[in-house]
Amino acid sequence: MKKLQIAVGIIRNENNEIFITRRAADAHMANKLEFPGGKIEMGETPEQAVVRELQEEVGITPQHFSLFEKLEYEFPDRHITLWFWLVERWEGEPWGKEGQPGEWMSLVGLNADDFPPANEPVIAKLKRL
């Protein structure tokens, strides 16, 4: 079984909105909403990975972030470890740098059914902030 380590950025602005993107139609979990992030590379820490991934995917450099949640999740074809980082200060303005649609969404507007199933506990925790 494939094992993946994923670093994810939950970008929260001063209006308590979260920046989300939509997965590509040909990606695993196609067309689902997601928090930007990606695979942790060999020799990279989760902290380094979230900085790199947010620079690559949404064009920001995190300045202040903290571990929000770490989860293990089993899919039929893969086991993933997800490191969710709450990013509250950054340089730049987030946008879909890789062509993916991106938008700010209120915490109230987050619906776990619109995201991959591994995100459900994180969305529930975010709504309690």
Curated annotation (Swiss-Prot):
Disruption phenotype: Disruption of the gene increases the rates of A:T to C:G transversion a thousandfold over the wild type level. GO terms for biological process: dGDP catabolic process; dGTP catabolic process; DNA repair; DNA replication; nucleotide-excision repair. It is an enzyme of class 3 (hydrolase). It catalyses: 8-oxo-dGTP + H2O = 8-oxo-dGMP + diphosphate + H(+); 8-oxo-GTP + H2O = 8-oxo-GMP + diphosphate + H(+); 8-oxo-dGDP + H2O = 8-oxo-dGMP + phosphate + H(+); 8-oxo-GDP + H2O = 8-oxo-GMP + phosphate + H(+). Keywords: DNA damage, DNA repair, DNA replication, Hydrolase, Magnesium, Metal-binding, Mutator protein. Pfam families: NUDIX. Mg(2+) binds at G37, E57. GO terms for molecular function: 8-oxo-7,8-dihydrodeoxyguanosine triphosphate pyrophosphatase activity; 8-oxo-7,8-dihydroguanosine triphosphate pyrophosphatase activity; 8-oxo-dGDP phosphatase activity; 8-oxo-GDP phosphatase activity; magnesium ion binding; manganese ion binding. The keyword DNA damage applies. Optimum pH is 9.0. 8-oxo-dGTP binds at R23, H28, E34, F35, P36, G37, N119. Its EC number is 3.6.1.55. A motif (Nudix box) lies at residues 38-59. Its cofactor is Mg(2+). Residues 1-129 form the Nudix hydrolase domain. Belongs to the Nudix hydrolase family. Monomer. NCBIfam families: mutt (TIGR00586), PRK10776.1 (NF008044). Specifically hydrolyzes both 8-oxo-deoxyguanosine triphosphate (8-oxo-dGTP) and 8-oxo-guanosine triphosphate (8-oxo-GTP) to the related monophosphates, thereby cleaning up the nucleotide pools and preventing misincorporation of 8-oxoGua into DNA and RNA. It prevents replicational errors by removing an oxidatively damaged form of guanine (8-oxo-dGTP) from DNA and the nucleotide pool. 8-oxo-dGTP can be inserted opposite dA and dC residues of template DNA with almost equal efficiency thus leading to A.T to G.C transversions. This is 8-oxo-dGTP diphosphatase. The gene is mutT.
